[in-house]
């Protein structure tokens, strides 16, 4: 009986955790479409100019650091500084994770 209760509890916790992850992914995808897609493409793979970087497959910690630097002004680009400024730390983290999970630049071993 105790094993059944533990199994049911774990199933409930994992189910809610997966739902939260799916919600975070959906929110990040929507934010990426609203804020990033016009220049970087919807999946971060088709930048509109050669000077615009591909975001797909970049490391999430790099993307997060870059966005935080644009937000603080430590990294300068008029467009990116303005776009990063209103983003919350959570949105930045979610965007970084979203683009890092898209197929792209990084070779996975």
Where are these regions (language model features)?
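C-terminal capping alpha-helices of c-type cytochrome domains
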Residues: 12, 75, 84-109
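N-terminal signal peptide c-region/cleavage motif recognized by signal peptidases
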Residues: 14-17
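Sequence/structural segment immediately N-terminal to covalent heme-attachment motifs in c-type
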Residues: 23-43, 56-58, 107
């Amino acid at each position: 009986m105790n094993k059944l209760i533990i199994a049911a509890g774990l199933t409930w916790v994992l189910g809610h955790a997966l739902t939260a992850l799916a919600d975070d992914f959906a929110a990040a995808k929507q934010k990426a479409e609203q804020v990033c897609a016009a220049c970087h493409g919807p999946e971060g793979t088709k930048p509109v100019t050669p000077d615009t970087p591909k975001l797909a497959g970049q490391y999430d910690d790099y993307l997060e650091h870059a966005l935080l630097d644009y937000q603080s002004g430590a990294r300068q680009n008029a467009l990116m500084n303005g776009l990063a400024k209103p983003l919350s730390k959570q949105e930045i983290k979610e965007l970084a994770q979203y683009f890092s999970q898209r197929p792209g630049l990084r070779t996975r071993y």
